[in-house]
Amino acid sequence: MRIIVDTNIIISAGLFPQSNVGKALAHIVKNHKLVLCQYTLDELKNVFKKKFPKRIEYFNKFVKKLKYELIDMDIKEYAKYPSIRDIDDIPLLANAIEAKADILITGDKDFDNIKIKTPQIIKPVEYIEKYMK
């Protein structure tokens, strides 16, 4: 399966690799195709610079070790995608749709009420229960 994850999933997995989220990301990388968009990587860099400035080198090594497919879609017409409360989340949703991801994993509640068939939008715990047991 093609699985795209949001920024917070990667941050949690990077900071806490033995956590459930860390184990889920490791499972995805081993058993599926992890898909990341350039928007997510840029957001990761910004978050680490602001919140974890002393761990930037660790972050860079962590991301370099991940096996993933990078997509860099220049999406300009956000109006054609389902609406979402936080407009900053539209690039992730749009990239997930355009990359034909099977699953989008996020803990962001803004994605809870989006009604689309593909990708299936699930929380990390749902991924663990459904695919890791």
Please annotate each region the language model reported.
Residues 5, 15, 21-50:
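PIN/NYN-family metal-dependent endoribonuclease catalytic core
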Residues 9-10, 40, 92, 110-111, ...:
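Alpha-helix capping/helix-boundary segments
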Residues 42-76, 92:
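Domain-scale selection of a single, long terminal region
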Residues 69-103, 109:
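Active-site neighborhoods of divalent-metal-dependent phosphate/nucleic-acid chemistry enzymes
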Residues 82, 109-133:
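Acidic, PIN/NYN-like endoribonuclease modules and their adjacent C-terminal/linker elements
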